[in-house]
Amino acid sequence: MSKIVKVLGREIIDSRGNPTVEAEVHLESGFVGMAAAPSGASTGSREALELRDGDKARFLGKGVLKAVAAVNGPIAEALVGKDAKNQAEIDQIMIDLDGTDNKANFGANAILAVSLANAKAAAAAKSMPLYAHIAELNGTPGVFSMPLPMMNIINGGEHADNNVDIQEFMIQPVGAKTLKEGLRIGAEVFHNLAKVLKSKGYSTAVGDEGGFAPNLKSNAEALEVIAEAVAAAGYELGKDVTLAMDCAASEFFDKEAGIYNMKGEGKTFTSEEFNHYLAELANQFPIVSIEDGLDESDWTGFKHQTELLGDKLQLVGDDLFVTNTKILAEGIEKGVANSILIKFNQIGSLTETLAAIKMAKDAGYTAVISHRSGETEDATIADLAVGTAAGQIKTGSMSRSDRVAKYNQLIRIEEALGEKAPFNGLKEVKGQ
């Protein structure tokens, strides 16, 4: 019934016009699972390797034919005849066959696409939705929740061609009673933000994740125009809508000088000074979550940041932890941050992703499920968020179908589950 009879890989195009890997897993029962690997722009140095061809004459070197060949060759040969329901075994076969610590032979993009396609095929064979299958794989059958969205409505940093240093300014519709209502609040704020920006003569062009990408006078101004938009939409900042930021500070950290160089504002900071700068912003605005507030290697600075802000703010490690249980375990032991961002392709398989979520939750850390700046119509992260009851999701703004695909899947899931999947809002955020 759930025996694998064929594994197929192909090169498709992602939301930034770059190739990525799509995989299909076919079962003897006729069921097929299909999934695509996302791709990041601001990446942690310790992420699993995304295998690119490097042939400058083709897709400027970004082709993924080598990764696709791994899917159609050694991965397919190893998996045919195996039971798709045994997700951990399937993932381990691919990891062992690759034989490297960072999936450098086949590419995390190849292994992940097959891993997720396998989960989808197994769910279909069990006649259950993907989120329900994920809950079973997670050891929490029937336990679901709808995630609080973090909507990236102003893009800066590596996600936009503008002068804003901080990469993401997000809103969270904490006053909503349901996920669907939260999306409505987000959409209304998003449209009002367009009006606010236009009234000030700013561009309303969007960045990689669907948020606006204007040139602003400062990072504080980004928060100010969002505050105006929230009010214009008829909501109360701090009550109906809270704020979150992804600094992606590794992108503006000068390793040689050991300083944070915010070129957009013409300011430089030491680790400690930047922590106090963030504290000041959090005092001025109802910011409840800060991601990658320092460089991924600045563990001393992160420890200070956690001591300074960790009791009142969610401090999320993305480049810091890269969805890796070994690195997360070190962070937990040292008391660094209090939350982890979960990105499938940072680690490269569903099984390892579930292990990172479990480790975080067991330690009292929150887990925020996340997209990447390079996405496809694949909406698996929506099912992951619900199936692990993670509580929070980052999947961009209220524009670009590669972002909205995930929100629409969440709407469908909420409709199907009803009261079985509560929307807990701000209660999901660490420190709130």
Curated annotation (Swiss-Prot):
GO molecular function: any one?
Answer: magnesium ion binding
Q: Which UniProt keywords apply?
A: Cytoplasm, Glycolysis, Lyase, Magnesium, Metal-binding, Secreted
Record field: catalytic activity: (2R)-2-phosphoglycerate = phosphoenolpyruvate + H2O
Instruction: Tell me yes or no: is Cytoplasm among this UniProt entry's keywords.
Output: yes
Task: Mention one GO biological process in which this protein takes part, according to its record.
Answer: glycolytic process
Q: Name one Pfam family in it.
A: Enolase_N
Report whether Ribosomal protein shows up as a keyword of the record: no
Q: Which pathway, per its entry?
A: Carbohydrate degradation; glycolysis; pyruvate from D-glyceraldehyde 3-phosphate: step 4/5
Q: How is the cofactor bound?
A: Binds a second Mg(2+) ion via substrate during catalysis.
| CDD domains registered for this protein in UniProt | enolase (cd03313)
Intracellular or extracellular location(s): Cytoplasm; Secreted; Cell surface
Q: Where does Mg(2+) bind?
A: D246, E291, D318
**UniProt-listed NCBIfam families:** eno (TIGR01060)
PANTHER family in the record? ENOLASE
Tell me, what does this protein do in biology? Catalyzes the reversible conversion of 2-phosphoglycerate (2-PG) into phosphoenolpyruvate (PEP). It is essential for the degradation of carbohydrates via glycolysis.
Q: Which family does it belong to?
A: Belongs to the enolase family.
User: What is the name of the protein in this document?
Assistant: Enolase
Q: Which species is the source of this protein?
A: Aliivibrio fischeri (strain ATCC 700601 / ES114) (Vibrio fischeri)
